[in-house]
């Protein structure tokens, strides 16, 4: 939501922080500690997606003080976490509540975020995750960045540690 006052981000070595205020000097709150990484906010501005080191991802329901009301771990159980980067790439699509996820040279998508129920579990889950069958051409390549296009929609860019960029 371009008109929203909500800001959410991962601060490496310093957790994940959120503010609900447009005031640049307002206090930011930390709902989850760890090496804060990538973050996303659902269109409803009630569901927050955050990652910490080694590919751990959570969906959280927060109050306006960024206190956890409910959570659910959601990184895919079928992914081999030994292929993750320390700060593992994740992005939320700019046009829809869809998350894209990297597993080394493999590429994942979850377009069923609304159906991930809160159960206050720290267990990984495959709910809604789909592995692209035609990920990168070589297993020696690693996806290091993922970005989506606003216009045109439905375009995803992958960058690799080998200095290649792919458009999907």
Question: Where on the chain are the PLM-derived regions?
Answer:
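Beta-propeller blade termini and top-face loops
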Residues: 1-168
